[in-house]
Amino acid sequence: VIPSGFQQALESGAEAELEGHVVWSRRSAAEELASEMEQYLETLLNTPVRVVTKGNLVYPPPQGTGSQGMIAVVLSLILVTTGGFLVPYLIFEEKQTHTMDALLVSPAAASDITIGKALAGIVHCLVAMAVVLAFNYSNVVAWGIVVLAVLVGALLAVGVGLLLGSGFETAQQVGAWSIIPILLLMAPVMLAMMGNLPPVLESVLPWMPTIALGNLFLLSFSGDATLARALPNLVLVLAWSLPLYVAVIWIVRRSDR
């Protein structure tokens, strides 16, 4: 940004000053970028120019596209696939070792068993997301929103995984059928990336849980991230998750008979 009086400073031979703005994801390189720009301007103008970047950060909008949009999509898909693919096999392994049978004859209620399995699955999702976020931390502005997004996303993904693991008895069944709900969860995100969709799809997609999850990650990359703005998407993901756990508890109770 060229301030008033810049031309006069150049003509007087005094050190001129410019206001430089740096995108949030490059904030750690602000001083280096300013130094490079100062050298370039001094060569161009034959006079020293100081570029001030302190406090001048540019945040991406919550409807971000480009790299931020792609990162949000990747985070959503990794979260969904981790819970959706891994958890069914964890449940199947417990069926093979008869750990599940022991739990069913124990005093633990069906809801207790479901909560225990959900917590184990959520831990796996959290570990996977911690690794992914470690490589993308520079894009995150609101870590609180990211944590909430990961938690509700893990609840959704683990709910899908528990339902698949509880409903099938063999590894072949799990492998053959688990891909279908995962693809159904991934499809809205892929469609949203295409753009130019029919009006019907454009009206339906915002109600899909993976779209809401992606919106939460996008919001966390922006400077406008607040809990109030995140709440509708948080509630939407939770609303999709709740019926999954109700179904899992019902299946576990039937297995106990």
What are these regions (language model features)?
Residues 108-139, 143, 234, 238:
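Selective transmembrane-helix segments that form parts of the transport pathway or gating/packing helices
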Residues 84-106:
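Transmembrane helix boundary and interhelical loop/hinge segments in multi-pass membrane proteins
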Residues 196-234:
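Short hydrophobic, aromatic-rich alpha-helical segments embedded in or entering the lipid bilayer
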Residues 70-89:
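Long, hydrophobic alpha-helical segments
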Residues 169-210:
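Transmembrane helix segments
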Residues 167, 221, 235-257:
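Junction motif at the cytosolic side of a transmembrane helix
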